[in-house]
Amino acid sequence: MEYLLLLIGFVLLIKGADFFVEGSSSLAKILKVPSVIIGLTIVAMGTSAPEASVSINAALSGSNDIAISNVVGSNIFNGLVVVGICAFIAGFSTNRDILKRDMPVNIIITAILCFMFIDGRLSRIEGIILLAGMAAYITCMIISALKNREEAEDCKIMPLPKSLLYIAGGLIAVIFGGNLVVDKACIIAANFGVSQNFIGLTIVAIGTSLPELVTSIVATRKGDSGLALGNAIGSNIFNILFILGMSAAIQPLHVLSESLIDCIILLASGIVLFLFAFTKKTMSRWEGAACILMYVGYTAYLFR
């Protein structure tokens, strides 16, 4: 029964995020908000809504291990599995902006997070610093996009009542789904005698990363495999700056020594991914296979 409820929680998270993005994007268009701002804020937040709901709910309920391991585990999964599978299906060229801006930012903020973890806690002040970094990053992206006149793909406009219904329904589903996932993950961890940190790094992290995986595979099958790298790196930046920042700002988090090791592994995987993408400005199929094998090795390390 616990597994069924956990699955229902994941479904509510993913579908709720879809409804929230669709309703919010439609409302923003009704209010004449530029498409680029919609793409860089609402859609970005919606994609990471499952991770946000789980980590914030975990922080509020005192399950610090899940709040942190969910983000770290999701980021490792995004970088190695999501990008790895898409590169293995069809190698792709890497975008110049991602190489010069997003990937270095991802490495830098992950290194900063490792430094913050050293003292065994993520304080409220550190959470606010991460949130300020998120605001600065989004501002820079919006300015850059408007300067280069880049527009995100237009979303469909729904009637105002329907847009509001989608937003409200999506938020309720995401919040309820997040509560369900945290509660059932804790029970499953207790039943099997494993740590919440382990459950957060595996089952919860993979479950909340499913939207990124599905979106990227669909894009790859349509011939736009390069989108996978942008999705993964953008999601990872958002997860660290906004989700961990918000979680710590709400409730300071205790950090296990294992979480510091996992964060260092995340940093190493980010550097390897950057080197793969930087060489010849492409991600080849063998590099994708190498990423997948690295994740298999990491999973084996968790089961040690």
Could you describe each region identified by the protein language model?
Residues M1-R304:
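Hydrophobic alpha-helical segments, chiefly the membrane-spanning helices
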